[in-house]
Amino acid sequence: MFILASASLSRKKLLRGHRFRVVPSGVREVRRKTLQATCVTNARLKADAVARRFPTEWVLAADTMVAYGGRIYGKPRDRKAAVRLLRALAGQTHTLGTGVVLQKGRFRIVKFVTSKVTLHDDPPVEKIVARTDPTQYAGGYAIREKNDPLIRRIDGSRSNVIGLPMEFLEPLLRKLEREAPAPVKRGRKVPLKGYILV
């Protein structure tokens, strides 16, 4: 059992099969100089906010952003902004990054994962934006299972583009469900390869 510090429907769907409850963090997102610093900082802020309220429970927090042309993009403020962004990304490859934090009290496991996303050359942007709420998604878009009218190719984790890198999270969450890990002292190695204690 853990707490998901997000109200994202996409993340809740990805976590089906796991026992969790939702407690949105209510944290205002910040921007840093790099995609990794931005995503990881926001995920840590979200995890901290919820972990302070529930210090004995595991908290899962995440933040997803898009980087293109030297700029970092989160959720567009409205449909017009989403249309402008998607037109700029059309036919191009951009980087989507997700910072993930799994935290219990003061102890954190941190992961940052990127995927490369290439859009079609001339996607029906207005139609896509009209039938979804682009203000709920980083970059202003969600992906379909098949025949996506917007996305031509994804290099890397597909679930990461949806909202969580499940290839990395799944074994970790299963391990937490099987075991009741004792607190890990700062500075000791994490018994899960590929994760960082910070």
Predicted segment positions?
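Short, glycine/serine-rich, charged loops/turns that create anion-binding
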Residues: 9, 27, 107
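Anionic-ligand binding patches
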Residues: 2-3, 34-198
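N-terminal beta1-alpha1 ligand-phosphate binding loop
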Residues: 1-20, 24
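Short, acidic/turn-prone active-site loops that include or flank metal/cofactor-
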Residues: 24-31
